[in-house]
Curated annotation (Swiss-Prot):
Gene Ontology molecular functions: ATP binding; proton-transporting ATP synthase activity, rotational mechanism
Entry function: Produces ATP from ADP in the presence of a proton gradient across the membrane. The gamma chain is believed to be important in regulating ATPase activity and the flow of protons through the CF(0) complex.
Subunit structure: F-type ATPases have 2 components, CF(1) - the catalytic core - and CF(0) - the membrane proton channel. CF(1) has five subunits: alpha(3), beta(3), gamma(1), delta(1), epsilon(1). CF(0) has three main subunits: a, b and c.
Keywords attached to this entry: ATP synthesis, Cell membrane, CF(1), Hydrogen ion transport, Ion transport, Membrane, Transport
Family indicated by similarity: Belongs to the ATPase gamma chain family.
Gene name, Swiss-Prot/TrEMBL: atpG
Gene3D superfamilies hit by this protein: 3.40.1380.10, ATP synthase, gamma subunit, helix hairpin domain
The protein's name: ATP synthase gamma chain
Length: 289
């Protein structure tokens, strides 16, 4: 039977771990709030660019940008946003499963796939299964900047510009609330058309003069829009990561408390048995005298 000393040692060890998980829970909660603020701050920028692109696209321009035109799909690209650290439940696993399912569906249509990865967990996983990886970046901070993630984005845009990709998707975790994060795959290119209602104008209301010329403007805005969408996806994935970690650490802290209660009960029983044994020995010794 385990001794009282060993039980006390286990209780102390669990309490020490519990302090760590509680601290990690609080840190994750703080980081989640900050990343949500970043997410809210960057969303209007992307929405406004999208509306301007929609205005230009509805203008019946002779120039049709390649990013707005459908192609026959032979190869697709995925910009995969994963985490650099673990301890966030099934966040990465669920995302990878969704990507593999989508890649399998593409393969059934004789469409090849290639990946550009943001986050060390994605790099480790897709390297382990031998997927085609064209670019990768790891070590993204909790407050990312566009230069931190631009490498994989530029690699995919270059492939699309050169005709080596016919569709481009971003795969990341969507932040729904603290308790719920959902893996999602969103089409980036070609850009899905917006109707007049989404833009907020009708063709009759056109009275805009653009400078520089629409072609130059589209070239710049479309690339900026894709970059902003990827950045938004990275920030949202960080929010999802911190929320999942906060929930996981809270569960670990609660489980630690339950384990301490169980160990304390075992310790009390062992202590009681020890006292009973000592009393029995004392009574037995007295009777012998």
């Amino acid at each position: 039977m385990i001794s009282a000393k060993e039980i006390r040692s286990k209780i102390a060890s669990v309490k020490s771990t519990q302090k760590i998980t509680k601290a990690m829970e609080m840190v994750a909660a703080s980081k989640m709030r900050k990343s949500q603020e970043s997410m809210s701050a960057t969303r209007p920028y992307a929405e406004m660019i999208r509306k301007v692109i929609g205005h230009l696209a509805l203008g019946n321009l002779e120039y049709k940008h390649p990013y707005l035109q459908e192609r026959k799909v032979k190869r697709v690209g995925y910009l995969v946003v994963s985490t650099d650290r673990g301890l966030c439940g099934g966040l990465n696993v669920n995302l990878f499963k969704k990507i593999l399912t989508d890649m399998h569906d593409q393969s059934e249509k004789n469409v090849a796939s290639e990946l550009s990865l943001i986050g060390s967990k994605g790099v480790a996983f897709f390297n382990s299964i031998g997927a085609k990886i064209v670019a990768q970046v790891t070590g993204i901070s909790d407050k990312p900047s566009l230069p931190d993630i631009i490498g994989p984005v530029q690699a995919m845009l270059k492939a699309y510009d050169e005709g080596r990709l016919d569709k481009l998707y971003i795969a990341n975790n969507r932040f729904i609330n603290t308790m719920s994060q959902q893996p999602q795959i969103t089409q980036l290119l070609p850009l899905l058309p917006m109707d007049e209602g989404q833009i907020g104008v009708t063709k009759k209301s056109w009275d805009y003069l653009y400078e520089p010329e629409p072609k130059v403007l589209l070239d710049t805005l479309l690339r900026r829009y894709i970059e902003s969408q990827v950045y938004q996806g990275v920030v949202e994935n960080i929010s999802s990561e911190q929320a999942a970690r906060m929930v996981a650490m809270k569960a670990a802290t609660d489980n630690g408390g339950n384990l301490i209660d169980e160990l304390q009960l075992i310790y009390n029983k062992a202590r009681q048995a020890s006292i009973t044994q000592e009393l029995t020995e004392i009574v037995g010794g007295a009777s012998a005298l």
